[in-house]
Amino acid sequence: MADVAIRIPKERRPRDATRAASRTAILDAARRVAARTGARELSLRGVAAEAGFAPAALYGYFRNKDELLLALAADDLTALARVMRDAGGLAGAGIAALDLLKGAETMAAASGAFAAGQGGDAERLFNGRLIAALKALSDASGLPTGSRAHQCDVVLLASALAGLALFARSGRLGALGFTPDEMIARLDSRFRG
């Protein structure tokens, strides 16, 4: 009887590992398709073809395009938290965040998933990673988070960075005569002063 109890987890591990590898392959394929066509134009059928899966197979991993976009954006948030933690200081974290966000169209594309209000695991994963990214920004910038007002400051700073990324990505920042470095320096002085 004990032998059976030991074998069951061993049988599950390869299946779980295979499922995780398949999910990773789907996300990698989705990122390639998004790079070619834009995240907003992403389709489950196109991702399935890129990943070498039957289109229906993707529904075992993601209920719809919104969930797939949320998963991509959650991965981008993990990368964002990492670069901000490694950058040191508000100016360094801001520049690193802006560089990453300029190329992360998935965040903007995923915003439509929130409007649909479907919730679920994908949204919970995104929210958890968003909190981790906000914490990394707070830590890197030295901003405290002990009060509601301080937490608002961190969210305002993150919102400013997201807006700057949108302006930079669309070419509007340069068209207005500003550089990312100049804007980050101004943010740094406003939040430090």
Regions found by a protein language model. Give the residues of each.
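Amphipathic alpha-helical interaction segments
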Residues: A25, E67, G92-A96, C152-A160, ...
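Amphipathic, non-transmembrane alpha-helical scaffold segments
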Residues: R19, L69, A73, L77, ...
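Helix-turn-helix
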Residues: A25, A29, V33-E67, A71
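Short hydrophobic clusters on alpha-helical segments that form packing/core surfaces
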Residues: S22, I26-A34, D76, L80, ...
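Amphipathic alpha-helical packing segments from all-alpha helical-bundle domains
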Residues: A116-S159, G177-R192
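Hydrophobic alpha-helical connector segments
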Residues: A71, R82-A110, R124-R129, S147
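N-terminal intrinsically disordered/low-complexity leader segments
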Residues: M1-A21, S170
